[in-house]
Amino acid sequence: MKKQNTFLRLAVPVLLCGIIVVGCRLSGSRSGFTREERRILFEQDSILYVTVVTDPSDSLILRTPCADLSDKMLKSKDFRLFSEKLKATVQAPWEDGVGIAAPQVGISRRVICVQRFDKEGEPFEVYPNIRIDSLFGAVTLSTEGCLSVPDLRGYVPRREGAVISYTDPETLTRVSETVRDFTAVIFQHECDHLDGILYTDRADSVFFSERSAAERMYYDSLGYYVKPSVLIR
C-alpha cells in the first residue's frame, strides 16, 4: 500500500540492507520454499521487484490466492531473508509504501509487511500466515494507493478496526491482536492481496494521480522498475 501523501523528490542515495548471499544452492528445498521462490529471493538484490497489474504475468500472480507457510519454512534462514527483503522493498524511496504483501514480489505465500503507526517508532513488521478474524466499527472511506497499481488512487470503504491473527515465527504459536484506524486499513488492504483482491475491486471510485504518475515516471527514468529475468515467464 502506498503512503497517503507522497511528493516528487530528487534522487536520494539509498543505503541498501547489507544482505550478502554466499554459495546458495537453489536446487535444494530444505527450507520448504520452492526452487522458484528461492530464485526470486536469492537472484535479486536487497530490494525486490514489485509486480504490477499492467504486466499480464504479474497480474496473474496478484490474482492468485496465497498458501500458508509451514513451521519448517518459518524457522528457515530463507524466511528471515524474505522478511528483511520485504522490509527493504516497501521502504525503498521509489516504492514509498506503508505495507506490502508477498504476491507483490512474486511469491504466493500468506505474508505481509506493515508499518505499525500505532506503535512507538512506527516500525515495519512482518506477519506470516496472517488472517483477519473479524472487523468492527464504522465504515469510512479511505484514500488508498498500491505499489502494484501504478498512477492511481481510490476511495475505499474500510472498517475502522480489525482483529488479526498470525503465526509467531519464533514460537510457532498463533497470536491474536486488535488494530484500529489507519493501521487497520493497511492490514485490510494487505490481507486482501493474499486472497487475490486489489483495492480497485472494493473502491467506490478510482482516479488518476498526477503526483504519483510523475513520481513513478521519474524513478522509471532511473531504471528502478526493470523486471528481472527471474520473473520473466
Which residue ranges define each predicted feature?
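Bacterial N-terminal signal peptides that target proteins for export
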Residues: 2-12
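Bacterial N-terminal signal peptides
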Residues: 11-21
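Positively charged
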Residues: 23-233
